[in-house]
Amino acid sequence: MAKVAKTHEDIEAQIREIQGKKAALDEEEGVGLDSTGYFDQEIYGGSDSRFTGYVTSIAANEQEDDDDDVSSATFEQKKPGYHAPVALLNDIPQSTEQYDPFAEHRPQKIANREDEYKQQRRKMIISPERLDPFADGGKTPDPKLNARTFKDVMQEQYLTKEEREIRQQIAEKAKSGDLKVVNGSSASSAAQPPSKRKRRWDQTGDQTPGSTPKKLSSWDQAEVTPGHTPSSLRWDETPGRAKGNETPGATPGSKIWDPTPSHTPAGVATPGRGDTPGHVTPGHSGATSSARKNRWDETPKTERDTPGHGSGWAETPRTDRGGDSIGETPTPGASKRKSRWDETPASQMGGSTPVLTPGKTPIGTPAMNMATPTPGHIMSMTPEQLQAWRWEREIDERNRPLSDEELDAMFPEGYKVLPPPAGYVPIRTPARKLTATPTPLGGLTGFHMPTEDRSMKSVSDQPSGNLPFLKPDDIQYFDKLLVDVDESTLSPEEQKERKIMKLLLKIKNGTPPMRKAALRQITDKAREFGAGPLFNQILPLLMSPTLEDQERHLLVKVIDRILYKLDDLVRPYVHKILVVIEPLLIDEDYYARVEGREIISNLAKAAGLATMISTMRPDIDNMDEYVRNTTARAFAVVASALGIPSLLPFLKAVCKSKKSWQARHTGIKIVQQIAILMGCAILPHLRSLVEIIEHGLVDEQQKVRTISALAIAALAEAATPYGIESFDSVLKPLWKGIRQHRGKGLAAFLKAIGYLIPLMDAEYANYYTREVMLILIREFQSPDEEMKKIVLKVVKQCCGTDGVEANYIKTEILPPFFKHFWQHRMALDRRNYRQLVDTTVELANKVGAAEIISRIVDDLKDEAEQYRKMVMETIEKIMGNLGAADIDHKLEEQLIDGILYAFQEQTTEDSVMLNGFGTVVNALGKRVKPYLPQICGTVLWRLNNKSAKVRQQAADLISRTAVVMKTCQEEKLMGHLGVVLYEYLGEEYPEVLGSILGALKAIVNVIGMHKMTPPIKDLLPRLTPILKNRHEKVQENCIDLVGRIADRGAEYVSAREWMRICFELLELLKAHKKAIRRATVNTFGYIAKAIGPHDVLATLLNNLKVQERQNRVCTTVAIAIVAETCSPFTVLPALMNEYRVPELNVQNGVLKSLSFLFEYIGEMGKDYIYAVTPLLEDALMDRDLVHRQTASAVVQHMSLGVYGFGCEDSLNHLLNYVWPNVFETSPHVIQAVMGALEGLRVAIGPCRMVQYCLQGLFHPARKVRDVYWKIYNSIYIGSQDALIAHYPRIYNDEKNTYIRYELDYTL
């Protein structure tokens, strides 16, 4: 409307125009009179339909519709809520479907925390048992037994070494391009000298020694054909502990050095660490035809016919489970292509039970390629396979062909069965089956449904009987327990195996009582079970990749216990045990390392030195560094167990080995580990050990030189401060070495010199320090982190010796030291940080605090917080050691200014800054007075900060500086701080509240009760509700503060308030922390002293009725403390009266209180002994064991307290009540009774006790004699001299004079 209508015509025209526009509008856009608002559609919803938001149609098929459009429309209509900005919401990690809220609380598996180096232990193979040369009186073993001797093991070790070298040569040739593909005999004869005679182990499988046709070598085949898995490798004999040479999951082919399989017991068939016999391959024993066979592979005729004479794996299923743990962890580099022979032995174990599958042991792919898997196979299936198998089983069960009997029952009479047409073949469509069966088992053709199949409706995944829960990871080890069998039908070996399995399952997964019983049983029956069956089951469990710390601890404990019992029977299994236990020696967990040492120590004592040396000798020059490292550590443990002298000849031979540098390296490492492990115990043998390894310092191998220097360093560290004369012979080569070497070698030589210098006399130390310092200063700028650590350590050691002057350090060492080491990156690595701080503190001890602090004080204002922390920690340690005497006024100002800045700028939560601030302020003492207002201003400002951490640090700082404020007479300032802290007692963060209470406690301690502001009468009622707080820090600080007030200022508070506090204190007796319970109990004593014992005692006696034992025990202690504080006569009447209550807990509590009471009051008990005797008579005759136990404890404390006060009559009376309890079997009761008898021996003398004893010492019953001799022995130990006069008289006979007349002399 451009203009306002004024005439009638204009108005009419305008109306028509508006109506026209309205008609043109969409009807939906209009707003009705009673419809929902148009502009507020997003609030109220603009739709009239009552069906809005509902799904209006359902999909015809069973799939869900896409409802996105509907749901989004519905969400658009909802009212907008008030919530945080989207950016903040996106920062919060949303939980996914896979999120496990309990993941962090689950016990971590050992495998999860292992680095790549430690994971090599899972590649180790548990070796077969070896021959015990000492068995049968050292007779020569029967060659038919094929026992593995030391010679066999060394030969296999040699072959493995040669194999690795050849592989390396091939790899180098391939790299350089010299490796050629050779086809045909002519090419091969051209490549090789024709006349050279092959050794027989260089011949391929199908060649005879006589004829040597030139054929492509197996190595060339392996290299030339990528992805080809050779079926029979000549070196497959010993995969050894080689580092990734063999894929543990792959099964090696036939080998040249196969022992004859037919005589091998099943338990032997565990592939070994450098000892794998060829017959371990399942399937190669006769079921497969190898690509190449040679005459060594020929086996007795019966092999194919009788399953029992096959390979060790096929005889008794899973007798030796050595391969299980290895096969199940595939090597990351394993070949992608897998043949069915590559299956792990573990997964085939289930099918090797001849009872359940007819014919020979099946070798096909387990579980999924079998019509009816055996229970063992079922356990090796994945959950998906198991589910598919169950479904198929159900379908087969429903659709199975009906039998004639069932058809007869269904149809009326008169029907007859028609024969099928000639040539009719029923349709078989295995593709439709969920799990197809490609090959019939055991040579049986056609359809075969075992009858057992119908009875076994489903296989339980938990063992029956009283056995603990089986985890999914455990099934492969304990699967036999899932099959219910009649044990009487099993052979003795199988029964034994099942028994061991049950006991191990109880130990691993059972409850503590179940575990205890099983552990005792397996220990007692260890010799009966035998070493082989036990270790064949325990060791694979220990190699399991899913093992947890607690489980490993329990299994190691089992080994420890059975070692004692088995003793020399363990010899053939020493190497097996070492393979599993040696990795514990390099575990990051200290307790695991201790357990490993303990096992190896006991093993050495059981097996003897000769067995240990012959077992571990092949591993000393193993190609794998991991094996050599763990072997060296194990040898050190053997040396500590059997004595260093017994091992010295062997070590001398190993360290001087000319054959391999690896042996020399390991021998010297053994010496180093002995020094680390045994410490100063090496001193008697120091010269011998140094002589053994000194030649290593000039060895041609760099690694040997390095380890020799490190071993010298370890020996010197262990011998400190003695033994410099033993190192005379190595000083010259070390001295030459530090001038010749660079890098790691130099670092090791410097370390050795660094440990030798502190052993020297002052003038020698000074000379050597000056000489070595030139090289050290040169190495200050080395970029190598390891070198830096060693240089810092050596500087610290050199500067710590007496002969080095402060002047020399100031001029020569300090400038380059601070230039190269006090840098930001040194603060980032924790080990460098620690070493730098320690070295700087050592330098300060020589040159004075001011010299060092003046160089680093400005760095307190550095922008890098980690660097500031390092500076602060150094200053704190220097001032803690040397004080602030040589710090001048200017440096003092810089120090306070820098510390305040660093304190305010800190963002991390550790206490370095706090400790540093406290140490510096306390060291400065009165000199800090001018800075106190500034410090307190900072503290008050930070107490008001919004960050809880900042408030906590401010409160902690008050508690650190309160003593200095008192020294500076700043009581007014402290009073002000007290008021401010009182106002902050409403703090909601428990950590901060605990710190505030700690600060109040510190102020109360130094300012005293009467000057305290706020006054105590206002402060204590404010603390009472805080006692309810369940946070340990709050509880501890609060109860300490209340106890201090109760001790020193009880008169400022009304008795009613103290009683209220008493009731709150009862709850604190339940605290987990012992310090809180102890403070609470003491506070009861202070309160009783302040307001009298009666009210407090009434509260405590009521608390004896509670169920919780810890609460009752603490209550009894509190009662005893009240008695001690307020004299026993105030407490005893009420206590003895309480004993009348016919309730077990109360009576036991009273007796316990009496026990503590007489323990605390000591000789004051002489006045009360007659009063409590009737009560003790009743308790000692009670049927309840605990009554008699506690009453015996009372008698013990009472008798020890009243010794020499003439109360023997009463004690003798009580002895008559105690004595009948000597035959109790409960360990707790007998311990209390023996304690009472010990106390009575002291109080009434050994004479009376011996008179009681004599009647039973020669009793006809052994049980009686045992008890009486035990009592007599304890009397004898305690009063040996006093007994002489009281032995019974034995009169002289014709030959002997027994009477000692001098004992009858009287003066």
UniProtKB/Swiss-Prot annotation:
Pfam families xref list: PPP2R1A-like_HEAT, SF3b1
InterPro entries listed in its UniProt record: ARM-like (IPR011989), ARM-type_fold (IPR016024), PP2A/SF3B1-like_HEAT (IPR054573), SF3b_su1 (IPR015016), SF3b_su1-like (IPR038737)
HEAT repeat residue intervals: 532-571, 572-606, 607-644, 646-680, 683-721, 766-804, 846-884, 1013-1051, 1055-1093, 1125-1163, 1166-1204
Family: Belongs to the SF3B1 family.
GO cellular component, one term: nucleus
Keywords: mRNA processing, mRNA splicing, Nucleus, Repeat, Spliceosome
Name this protein carries in UniProt: Splicing factor 3B subunit 1
Compositionally biased spans, kind Polar residues: 204-220, 345-355
Biological source species: Xenopus laevis (African clawed frog)
Keyword Nucleus set for record: yes
Main localisation: nucleus
Record GO terms (molecular function): mRNA binding
Protein purpose: Component of the 17S U2 SnRNP complex of the spliceosome, a large ribonucleoprotein complex that removes introns from transcribed pre-mRNAs. The 17S U2 SnRNP complex (1) directly participates in early spliceosome assembly and (2) mediates recognition of the intron branch site during pre-mRNA splicing by promoting the selection of the pre-mRNA branch-site adenosine, the nucleophile for the first step of splicing.
Superkingdom as given in the UniProt entry: Eukaryota
GO process annotations (BP): mRNA splicing, via spliceosome; spliceosomal complex assembly
